[in-house]
């Protein structure tokens, strides 16, 4: 399965840390979108609009330019997944995989989208002792996605 690691071009330190924490992982670096460099007009020209009045219901903060860049990075990967018609393991550059992580085993699961790591903002629902259904996941630290 193709593995992409999202990393800002000026954050080589984060990629070095990722490599140190995940030394045996083969991956392709995905150049993250730098949200602070994108103007509102460019977002509109690409078909995106942001609600300037939106407030995060948990953190009680407005959407930041960094969060817009983060979304766009993931959105471009989702488009790539559909275009290439292949599943992708998506990791942000601060993800740390455990020694028990088995990409071959996990890729056998029947799924469209599987969170592998997130910040839990609410209790998750246990499915079978190995899998849980997040109620309100926060962050997109690690997940697998299929083109379906």
Per-region residue spans from a language model:
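An acidic/histidine-cluster motif and surrounding catalytic segment
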Residues: 1-91, 95-148
């Amino acid at each position: 399965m193709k593995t992409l690691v999202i990393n800002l071009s000026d954050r080589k330190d984060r990629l070095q840390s990722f490599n140190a924490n995940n030394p045996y992982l083969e991956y392709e670096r995905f150049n993250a979108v730098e949200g602070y460099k994108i103007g509102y007009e460019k977002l509109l020209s690409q078909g995106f609009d942001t609600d300037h009045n939106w407030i995060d219901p948990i953190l009680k903060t407005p959407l930041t330019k960094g969060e817009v860049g983060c979304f766009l990075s993931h959105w471009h990967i989702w488009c790539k997944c559909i275009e290439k018609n292949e599943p992708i393991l998506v990791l942000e550059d601060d993800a740390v995989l455990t020694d028990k992580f088995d990409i071959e085993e996990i890729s056998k699961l029947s799924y469209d989208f599987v969170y592998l790591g997130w910040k839990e903002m609410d209790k998750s629902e246990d499915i079978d002792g190995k899998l849980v259904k997040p109620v309100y996941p926060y962050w997109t630290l690690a997940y697998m996605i299929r083109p379906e």
